């Protein structure tokens, strides 16, 4: 009799635990009213404005809470695995994945580099191809930077034109650097950063002072000097400078996050291309005004 009672109680306990797990799981994927307000502000406001550092700090804290609650490695991994079917995620789920991509652009260069990772995730989810990682890391951010509603970008708002502008300007700038008399081989990484910034301004016009000072104050960290004359390596090392700026280890994209997101890249060259690709999107969306370009 005692054994039967114990078995019944055990079964009830297991069932109760299962119900609680399901309930908690469902709750964790449902925005509460306060979170809906925050999310609405992020995805519908092209340029977020706060009156003080304290307001920014409070807002950033709420965004971090949202990211921690909804964008766990497990959720990201799931999104990546089912992302080849763009209809597999609801629009709200897509927005939540893009969410962590947005505040970096809205808050400026030092707002957080993790948008590169999450923008890439959004790319694979939305476009359904690994190749899109090289483009969407910048595209979602560019929507925020130039006043394009990110939700519209998800629905396909002229993404091809944005990609062409991003890729075109990046290629022009790199070609200008590599075909000039600049001594890239013997130049320090920081000197190259300064030169690239100067060349950009000569080609495309001045950068805002605050943005320019932020770029030029980057911590070059572990970058090895002199950098290689090889364009791909030069691009990758320049990207690493930005990774270091935000305190993220320079192999975070190519090792830990790719493993979490269940992506297998064939070799180190492919990893380098992905790293450089995400960085290209970052530079393009952050440094270059896209709106109104042909």
Can you say where each PLM-predicted feature lies in the sequence?
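Bacterial N-terminal signal peptides that target proteins for export
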Residues: 1-11
């Amino acid at each position: 009799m005692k054994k039967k009672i114990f078995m019944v109680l055990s079964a009830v306990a297991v069932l109760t635990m299962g119900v609680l797990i399901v309930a908690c799981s469902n709750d964790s994927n449902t925005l509460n009213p306060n979170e809906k307000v925050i999310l609405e502000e992020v995805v519908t406001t092209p340029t977020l404005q706060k009156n003080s550092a304290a307001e920014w700090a409070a807002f950033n804290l709420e965004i971090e809470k949202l990211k921690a609650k909804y964008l766990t490695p497990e959720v990201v991994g799931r999104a990546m695995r089912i992302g080849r079917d763009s209809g597999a995620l609801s629009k709200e789920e897509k927005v939540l994945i893009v969410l962590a991509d947005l505040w970096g652009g809205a808050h400026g260069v030092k707002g957080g580099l993790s948008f590169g990772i999450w923008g890439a995730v959004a790319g694979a989810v939305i476009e359904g191809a690994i190749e899109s990682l090289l483009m969407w890391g910048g595209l979602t951010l560019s929507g925020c930077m130039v006043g394009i509603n990110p939700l519209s970008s998800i629905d396909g708002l002229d993404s091809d034109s944005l990609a062409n502008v991003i890729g075109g300007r990046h290629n022009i700038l790199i070609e200008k650097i590599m075909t000039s008399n600049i001594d890239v081989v013997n130049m320090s990484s920081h000197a190259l950063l300064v030169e690239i910034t100067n060349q950009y301004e000569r080609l495309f016009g001045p950068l805002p002072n605050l943005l320019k000072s932020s770029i030029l104050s980057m911590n070059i960290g572990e970058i090895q000097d002199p950098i290689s004359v090889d364009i791909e390596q030069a691009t990758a090392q320049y990207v690493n400078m930005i990774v270091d700026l935000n305190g993220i280890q320079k192999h975070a994209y190519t090792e830990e996050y790719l493993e979490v997101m269940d992506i297998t890249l064939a070799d180190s060259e492919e990893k380098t291309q992905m790293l450089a690709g995400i960085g290209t999107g970052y530079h393009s969306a952050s440094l270059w005004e896209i709106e109104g370009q042909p």
